[in-house]
A protein has these predicted regions:
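Active-site-lining helix/loop region of Rossmann-like oxidoreductase modules
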Residues: 1-94
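C-terminal active-site/capping subdomain that shapes the small-molecule cofactor and substrate pocket
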Residues: 57-172
Length: 172
């Protein structure tokens, strides 16, 4: 749909679109239908699956899922509150050592995660690690904000399935 709309924006005829509005050069803050509280089905899925993956039903999530005009990769701006104090530098150190993660965090020199970097890879790119300025005084030293990107087909589905199978069957 995006490729067809880019052609249309360049004066060529576009085929039918699966989106309710033009997606080329646009953002659509809706993925799926809305519930009575105003959350889309994708937002509810993200909240429910996040708790399930982390094995903690008490974790609170707030998210807005937005359809963006790119072909591959998902991106997330994430704010985290930890039980103990953590500095952005310590978080960067831990992320740099994490398997499957690429720390891409030098914003002053234009180095940060972007979908174009992550497409067709099994890696999660993380950057823009910084203090959460919305945190209150009690949690300020325990709160960070970061940005990450990953290919949702490779890392979000296929690679995760292979990695889980490797763990279950002791293949790695």
């Amino acid at each position: 749909a995006l490729e067809a709309e880019v052609k249309a924006a360049n004066g060529q005829r576009a085929e039918g679109s699966c989106f309710p509005y033009p997606i080329a050069y646009n953002l659509i803050p809706q993925i799926g239908g809305f519930n009575e509280m105003g959350y889309s089905s994708e937002e509810m899925k993200m909240q429910n699956e996040g708790r399930k993956m982390l094995h903690d039903e008490t974790i609170r999530f707030a998210c807005t899922c937005v359809r963006v005009p790119i072909i591959r990769s998902h991106s997330e701006a994430i704010t985290l509150e930890f039980e103990n104090d953590i500095t952005p530098d310590k978080a960067r150190e831990l992320l740099a050592e994490a398997p499957g993660v690429v720390l891409c965090d030098d914003p002053n020199n234009g180095q940060y995660p972007m979908p174009l970097l992550t497409s067709d890879q099994d890696l999660v790119y993380v950057g823009r690690v910084r203090r959460d300025l919305s945190a209150d005084a009690a949690s300020f030293n325990r709160s960070l904000t970061l940005f990450c990107c990953a290919d949702q087909v490779r890392k979000g589905a296929a690679t995760n399935a292979v990695q889980i199978a490797e763990l279950i069957f002791g293949l790695k």
